[in-house]
A protein has these predicted regions:
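Short, conserved charged micro-motifs
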Residues: 296-301, 339-343
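PLP-dependent enzyme catalytic core of the Aspartate aminotransferase-like
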Residues: 307, 322-360
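Glycine-centered flexible beta-alpha turn that most often forms the glycine-rich phosphate-binding loop
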Residues: 165
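N-terminal "arm"/small-domain region of PLP-dependent enzymes with the aminotransferase-like
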Residues: 1-40, 52, 160, 306-311, ...
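Structural signature of PLP-dependent enzymes
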Residues: 219-226, 242-266, 295-297
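Conserved glycine-rich beta-strand-loop-beta hairpin in the small C-terminal domain of fold type I
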Residues: 239, 256-266, 277-291
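Conserved core of the PLP fold type I
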Residues: 32-158, 169-187, 258, 356
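Active-site PLP attachment segment
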Residues: 182-218, 230-233
Length: 360
């Protein structure tokens, strides 16, 4: 099966030998500490490094077992049944599942080609706004600089907490980097999270949050009550990679491998899709969003595609209650080879063209 379903790095992106060496070095240097329990907010030296990177005190950094675990903690702290939470439409499906499980009322904010539309934020009280401004999951879109400034302004004016999720920001193939909303707002009303899953390795399970001091303490307490302390060995391994100067060269290598896949995906879509199809052209990240106005419903297309040996994620999965994306698909290009991408999109294209009206 050719899978466009999961946003995970290809096996060749993983620096196995160097990470093994980093883990060995970390154990030799500080093994008795990193093999024991410790503070629930994470490995102190890595918190210090992240604090310097973001210009905050280390106590405002909480390192979690992947950033999604941190999202669970944040939602548990802020959400009760009936609590209103804002999300982009479409948005990452796993936070939708978490919020629904907690009984939140999920309210959507529309997007266009420039990302979330800040001036469409509805009035009222909300626990927070969840946004992925850079190379968004699932759409691949990036929030423009003007809109980032506007979002920071609105967050300040309305005292709205914004959770900026930024796991893909460093995985850029072209174009100039944009400042984060957190940077533009100088941290006011913005909580920031990211992860080493897309830049180093997902199996390390190292994500982090930059939070207001009081909220950071509350989230750390939740972490302690949940798993006592996060795994320090993986955090120390990441820190060793950073401190020996290997993070940036590895990121450049990973970005090059993923750029080839992004290019292969865009080329294949251009060749294979019916004339009325449209798709995003991300400058980074892992995903392309495909719209097929004349195609079958995404659930039907997925069933046909799986029978043809291809899988993807239905657009409906990224909208609360499945209300949207009925003829859309998220295609992840990060895991499969360029050759597999060409073949998989060819199979999808055949199915899409077969469903399109003859005039197309």
């Amino acid at each position: 099966v050719i899978s466009f379903a999961r946003g995970v790095p290809a096996p060749e992106c993983l620096a196995v030998e160097e990470l093994a060496d980093c883990a060995r070095a970390a154990l030799e240097r500080n093994g008795r500490t990193i093999l024991s329990y410790g503070p629930g907010g994470g490995y102190g030296p890595l918190r210090e490094w992240l604090g310097e990177r973001h210009g905050v005190e280390p106590g405002r950094i909480v390192i979690t077992s992947g950033s999604l675990q941190g999202f669970v903690f944040l939602a548990q702290q802020l959400v009760r049944p009936g609590t209103r939470v804002l999300v982009e439409a479409p948005t990452y499906d796993r936070p939708l599942t978490i919020l629904t499980r907690l009984g939140a009322e999920v309210v959507t904010v529309p997007m266009d080609e420039d990302g979330l539309v800040p001036d469409e934020l509805p009035e009222g009280e909300f626990a927070f706004l969840y946004t992925i401004p850079t190379f968004q999951n699932p759409s691949g879109r990036t929030l423009s600089l003007e809109r980032r400034r506007r979002l920071a302004e609105l967050a300040r004016e309305r005292r709205l907490l914004v959770l900026e999720d930024d796991p893909y920001g460093l995985v850029r193939y072209e174009g100039e980097p944009l400042p984060s909303v957190f940077e533009l707002a100088e941290g006011e009303q913005i909580a920031y999270c990211s992860s080493f899953s897309k830049t180093v390795a997902p199996g390390l399970r190292v994500g982090w949050f930059v939070l207001p001091a009081q909220l950071a303490a509350q989230i750390e307490a939740l972490a302690v009550s949940t798993y006592i302390s996060p795994p320090y060995l993986s955090q120390a391994t990441v820190l060793e990679l950073v401190q020996r100067g290997s993070f940036e060269p590895n990121l450049e290598r990973v970005t090059g491998l993923l750029r080839e896949r992004r290019d292969a995906m865009l080329e294949a879509l251009e060749l294979q899709m019916p004339e009325d199809a449209s798709w995003t052209r991300p400058e980074g990240g892992y995903f392309v969003w495909l719209d097929l106005p004349s195609g079958p419903p995404a659930a039907d297309l997925l069933a046909q595609a799986e029978a043809a040996g291809v899988t993807f994620v239905r657009g409906t999965d990224f909208f609360p209650g499945g209300r949207g994306g009925e003829r859309s698909a998220r295609l992840a290009f990060s895991f499969v080879s360029p050759g597999e991408i060409a073949e998989g999109v060819s199979r999808l294209g055949s199915l899409a063209r077969a469903a399109a009206p003859a005039s197309l």
